[in-house]
Amino acid sequence: IDDFEDDYPEESLLEMKRKHEDAIAAQCDLIYTEPTELLMVTSPIKGRYPVKISFKSCANAVMPQKRVSGSNGQRIQIEVEDDYHSTHYWESVSRGLERRFFQTVTAILEESPNVHFSVFPLAPMPLIMKLGYKMGDKVRAEVFQYSRSRDSWNWNTHEQTNHFSAEKQILREGRRVALVLSLTADIAPTRITEVYNADILYFIRAEHFGVDCIQSQADLVAFWREYQRVCDEIKNIYPQIREIGVFPAMPVSAA
């Protein structure tokens, strides 16, 4: 700098100093925030299209509200061994998820039961739903939604941008229930009854359909409340039911 004074006027040096001090201050502030384990879950879409999740992009999504634990995060990568349309495929990836979940999440929880997870999933929908089942509501976790248009895991806003409502349709007497989650697209009842002999249909619909129907944590909370309310209603009205059909058209964060 001393040898090239004309290239570094006082204003530029002061701006460099300010940016450096701001960066140091931001890092120091993170010391006092809660740590979180980044959990990145991937499996080829439709069994053919590989996906990758950037650790840096995930870290940017959680900071500065949380501090990232470790330098690489936790990865659950489920490899495909069978044809996507075969029953062997789902049996294989389900076993793979069980095994990797035990090796990562369960192992961490055994050491630190109160640990917080930030979850970043890119995988076929049934596999993500199984991941949600495995984590349950006892594990402290926040799920993030990938935006393909912005190539980012950051929420688009902090405000609620969508609303969710439920509808019940009784087709005939009986206790065979289907739960239809119409968030990214509206699913017609005939598409359900063509493949599932349902007596009762429960729909949860987004006010605004589309891949961007969940744009914030507030949207996710609103959907979750309506989902819990419908599940409670099914349980209370049909207590003897042990199985229902689930038909999802929804983003990964809601799964």
Regions flagged by a language model, labelled:
Residues D2-A255:
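Long, low-complexity, Lys/Arg-enriched
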